[in-house]
């Protein structure tokens, strides 16, 4: 039961961090900094 809880927490944290990372990476794309990448 403890292993299942740890697995669930790991998956939740993974998706939350992935969502936050995607949100933060989308912010600079709208800024003029995108021209530097191109």
From Swiss-Prot:
The keyword Transmembrane applies. HAMAP family: PSII_PsbI. Its main location: plastid. It is found in: Plastid, Chloroplast thylakoid membrane. It holds the Pfam family PsbI. The chain crosses the membrane at residues 4-24. GO terms for biological process: photosynthesis. Keywords: Chloroplast, Membrane, Photosynthesis, Photosystem II, Plastid, Reaction center, Thylakoid, Transmembrane, Transmembrane helix. SUPFAM superfamilies: Photosystem II reaction center protein I, PsbI. It comes from Chlorokybus atmophyticus. It is a single-pass membrane protein. PSII is composed of 1 copy each of membrane proteins PsbA, PsbB, PsbC, PsbD, PsbE, PsbF, PsbH, PsbI, PsbJ, PsbK, PsbL, PsbM, PsbT, PsbX, PsbY, PsbZ, Psb30/Ycf12, at least 3 peripheral proteins of the oxygen-evolving complex and a large number of cofactors. It forms dimeric complexes. GO terms for cellular component: chloroplast thylakoid membrane; photosystem II reaction center. This is Photosystem II reaction center protein I. One of the components of the core complex of photosystem II (PSII), required for its stability and/or assembly. PSII is a light-driven water:plastoquinone oxidoreductase that uses light energy to abstract electrons from H(2)O, generating O(2) and a proton gradient subsequently used for ATP formation. It consists of a core antenna complex that captures photons, and an electron transfer chain that converts photonic excitation into a charge separation. Belongs to the PsbI family.
